[in-house]
């Protein structure tokens, strides 16, 4: 019997759609799912810890990671670099663990080229007005940066057709239930079951 590898789950969507909140709640409810910590050159937000939420790196350190092909994907977003360290993700999937990546859309498209068997989920807010309110509520960015994020979000919505699923994050419990249903359905797909049934 073949080894049953884990799922690679890619969660992305516009800034402020609530990807981080949904990811944290999904991990709380499904401890068998592992979170892939991304590397970034952006400054930590209040409460974020290096190695737990992100690997916070200088631009020079990040450039070295790119040159040494240590990243599964990387992208520049709003003036900062983001990327996914490759080794830990591949090791976890081969060991049978499900791994979730919470990454930007540019990065998700790179991952899709390398891992088309992944599960690609696009998280959207219920409206652009709601998205604007969420980003303003953070209180961590200037108005100029917020407007840039909103303009980027409008462009990013054009990529929804590149994903397998779309989840509207209106109410967190409902959105998390949708994510759990997607993962359950993917686990049951025939193409992911290496078994041959005999005598049925």
Curated annotation (Swiss-Prot):
Provide the Guanylate kinase-like domain boundaries: 6-184
Keyword list (alphabetical) reads: ATP-binding, Cytoplasm, Kinase, Nucleotide-binding, Transferase
Top-level enzyme category: transferase
Q: According to the UniProt entry, what is the EC number of this protein?
A: 2.7.4.8
Q: Which residues are noted in the entry as ATP-binding?
A: 13-20
Which InterPro entries does the record match to this protein?
A: GK/Ca_channel_bsu, Guanylate_kin-like_dom, Guanylate_kinase, Guanylate_kinase_CS, P-loop_NTPase
Q: Where does it live in the cell?
A: Cytoplasm
The reply to whether Nucleotide-binding figures as a keyword in the UniProt entry is yes
Protein name in the entry: Guanylate kinase
Q: What is the lineage of its organism?
A: Bacteria, Bacillati, Bacillota, Clostridia, Eubacteriales
């Amino acid at each position: 019997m073949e080894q049953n590898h884990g799922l690679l789950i890619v969660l992305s969507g516009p800034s402020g759609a609530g990807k981080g909140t949904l990811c944290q709640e999904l991990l709380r409810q499904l401890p068998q799912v592992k979170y892939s910590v991304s590397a970034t050159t952006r400054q930590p937000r209040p409460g974020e810890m290096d190695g737990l939420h992100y690997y916070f790196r200088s631009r020079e350190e990040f450039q070295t990671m790119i040159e040494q092909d240590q990243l599964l994907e990387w992208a520049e977003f709003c003036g900062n670099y983001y990327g996914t360290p490759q080794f830990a993700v591949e090791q976890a999937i081969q060991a049978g663990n499900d791994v979730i990546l919470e990454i930007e859309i540019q990065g998700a498209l790179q991952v899709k080229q390398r891992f088309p068997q992944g599960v690609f989920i696009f998280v959207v807010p219920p409206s652009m007005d709601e998205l604007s309110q969420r980003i303003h509520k953070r209180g961590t960015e200037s108005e100029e940066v917020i407007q840039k994020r909103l303009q980027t979000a409008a462009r990013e919505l054009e990529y929804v057709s590149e994903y397998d699923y779309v989840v509207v994050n209106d109410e967190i419990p409902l959105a998390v239930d949708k994510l759990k249903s997607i993962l359950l359905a993917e686990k049951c797909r025939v193409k992911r079951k290496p078994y041959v049934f005999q005598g049925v």
